[in-house]
Regions:
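A hydrophobic, helix-centered structural microdomain
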Residues: 255-318, 355, 424
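Short, glycine-rich, amphipathic interfacial segments at transmembrane boundaries or analogous
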Residues: 226-227, 233, 294-334, 395-411
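Juxtamembrane loop-helix boundary motifs flanking transmembrane segments in multi-pass membrane proteins
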Residues: 4, 8, 71-75, 79, ...
Length: 427
């Protein structure tokens, strides 16, 4: 199978996977709608076409949120990321449909059927995504790629690429020291399935990129910060020379308004849903050592503004009584047994829903850093302050796509990718 046909077949498989998930979830919604909601409308019950239109609207919601959260990238993203995206899609679509049902009823609709439907959607999306992931792995073998690196060895990147053996195999690697002519020869010999351009100087990287473009060879780049900053630049055609406009002004008023509205809605719903879990966590912390339940600490949010972030206490009392700020390590002796559980399950983060409700934080955004730790990062990476163009978040790209040992520089890149991708449909 040549590479162009392979991509066409992969695209077809993605379309089939998305269609299967949407049709299954629409079928589930149709059953729940007919059984629990359709007969309780304050108007006369819909005719068949009316019920069909409601199901179609639900399907459109699924497609929109699937696009926003990346749920269509089956066979491309990690299986866990796809399942997370599908779960977010089902949650948002079902929440929106529940609000729509409220408008159609005389009183507040039953929420338990909607919760049950959401759980069924989670299971269906997870199973279908897993099945298609396995099918992708069987039908499309991994690409054998050529890694070109600069003055710094790329063992870390090579290791990460090899952690996805279903997608990539670094079959050959070469340093830029061999010269541009030899690099082009190596691309012709070993890079027909793909070339990875590591941390190269811009001039050489651009020439190699043009060479691969002319040869129709797929290229993977480790982006520079400037690459990320112009991702959403606006093309201007005001005369015969093309211009790109990078506004660099943060969120617009309508983006801030919509993001704040969504934060209020999500934080309110989650505070209600998770209140029993938070009560149990608070009792466990108090009973263990009789110390304070909550822990607050200064963090930074938009514009460098300081605020107190709230968490359930997971460490011993006075864990930093010497006044020295230290990041928690993997097997930190200061973490209590209760703390290990609530950290592993992220329950310790739930009080930050109050920060979101107050407006200090957002649901999605760069994680808030302590002022002293942020200062340390900025000494070696001055651009680290760019993360403060938006509110700090409960979760963000660095948490979703990163790992415990992801470098501060890579976390910065991930956070900037989120900031530069913000729009009215991606907030």
């Amino acid at each position: 199978m040549n590479y162009k046909n392979r991509e066409q077949y992969k695209h077809l498989m993605r379309v089939l996977a998305v269609a299967a998930i949407v049709l299954l979830e629409c079928a589930v919604f149709s059953v729940f709608w007919d059984r629990y909601y359709a007969s309780h409308l304050w108007l006369e019950p819909f005719w068949d076409k009316g019920n069909q239109i409601i199901v179609v609207i639900y399907g459109i919601f699924l497609l929109v949120f699937m696009y926003i959260y990346g749920g269509m990238k089956i066979g491309y993203m990690k299986g866990s990321s796809i399942i997370y995206s599908q779960m977010m899609t089902a949650f948002c679509a079902n929440a929106l449909m529940y609000l729509q049902i409220i408008l159609l009823w005389r009183h507040l609709p039953y929420i338990l059927p909607m919760v049950g439907m959401t759980l069924v959607d989670f299971a269906l999306a997870g199973i279908v995504s897993w099945l298609f992931e396995k099918t992708f792995a069987r039908l499309f073998p991994p690409r054998e790629v050529l890694l070109i690196y600069g003055e710094y060895p790329m063992e870390s990147l090579e290791l990460k690429m090899n952690q996805r053996p279903d997608k990539y195999i670094v079959a050959h690697k070469v340093s830029v020291e061999v010269g541009e002519k030899e690099l082009c020869r190596q691309i012709d010999a070993y890079g027909q399935e793909g070339v990875i351009l590591g941390d190269l100087h811009s001039e050489l990287r651009n020439r190699l990129l043009k060479y691969c473009y002319a040869k129709e060879i797929r290229v993977y780049l480790t982006p520079k910060l400037s690459d990320i900053m112009v991702r959403k630049a606006e093309a201007l055609h005001i005369f015969d020379t093309p211009l790109l406009l990078a506004r660099n002004s943060g969120l617009s008023f309508d983006q801030r308004f919509c993001k704040r509205l969504l934060d209020l809605l999500v934080s309110t719903i989650l505070l209600v849903i998770t209140s029993p879990i938070m009560l149990i966590a608070a009792l466990c912390i108090k009973l263990y050592d009789h110390g304070p339940v909550f822990f607050k600490q200064k963090r930074l949010t938009i514009g460098g503004k300081e605020f107190y972030v709230y968490k359930f206490r997971s460490m011993i009392v006075d864990a930093e009584k010497d006044g020295v700020a230290r990041l928690a390590t993997k097997n930190d002796s200061r973490i209590t047994p209760v703390g290990k559980v609530i950290r592993a399950t992220r329950i310790d983060e739930l009080p930050q829903l109050l920060n979101i409700f107050k407006g200090d934080m957002s649901v999605v955004g760069p994680r808030p850093e302590r002022p002293e730790i942020a200062k340390e990062y900025e000494e070696s990476i001055p651009e680290f302050a760019y993360r403060l163009k938006v509110k700090a978040g409960l979760t963000g790209y660095a948490q979703i796509y990163g790992k415990y040992n992801t470098t501060a520089y890579d976390k910065l890149k991930l956070d900037l990718m989120y900031i530069e991708s913000l729009s009215l449909i991606h907030i």
